[in-house]
Amino acid sequence: MIRIVRGALVALSLCARAAIGSAQHSTDGGAPAVNAPLVAPDSIAPYGRVDGALLRPASYTYQLTLVRNAVQTPLGVRAVQISESNAGGVPGWLIAESRTGSAVPTTDSLWVSRTDLSPARWAATIDRTQLGVSFSRDSAFGAVQSYRGRASFAAAVPAGALLTGGMVERVIELLPLREGYRAAASLLLFDLATPRALDAEIAVERAERTRVGSVDMDCWVVTLRAGVLTQRLWVTRDAPRVVKSEQATAGGILLSVLQ
């Protein structure tokens, strides 16, 4: 299974990039296959509408490291860029990502609405596999092209579904984080070119002062859970931004730290 879990859990975003193709794992320390049954969050409200007008153009660079038995192995660099862009003639945002220095280079380009960050169009690559998706209010239409050929699909999409790592981070930064905050979410998974939504939960685990580089920062530690999979993100309390994240994988702990 060629895994594109970036955001949503590779490159430290649980949601959005799971399987394209057949049973072959990524070689860069990606998330394990999602085979266990996923448990829906109990009766908590979804995270609701975020104010996309609060987003600003920005660029972030994260160093990726795999930690196993106290040994750290660099996995390359993940770059995220947010810019103003039009999708179908409608003003919006482009959340573009690239991962370099790893065994398999990957890219994501996600166009979202300016008002609430709902997805409009998504283009992604992992090595020679390509994904293209267009979204309506409650549906997705797209195609996957790989060495195995081309497959198209159409599927229902829950409102507020999360896709890429960059989208997950931007949404979490715009949430009203506080002690005890919990909200339900949906992660969109592509398995053998068939989209399916996974129930997930976003929760503030604790407040913590953490060091990023040479600077100590006051952060919320936010967990994103879908069944047996968990990602933690450190979000600064002032001028919120994701400065660190971690995820347990089959190969060790995958760390992502803002440079």
Labelled PLM ranges:
Residues 147-181:
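Surface-exposed beta-loop interaction hotspot
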Residues 1-6:
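Positively charged n-region of N-terminal signal peptides that target proteins for export
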Residues 7-17:
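Bacterial N-terminal signal peptides
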Residues 18-23:
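Boundary at the C-terminal end of the N-terminal hydrophobic targeting segment
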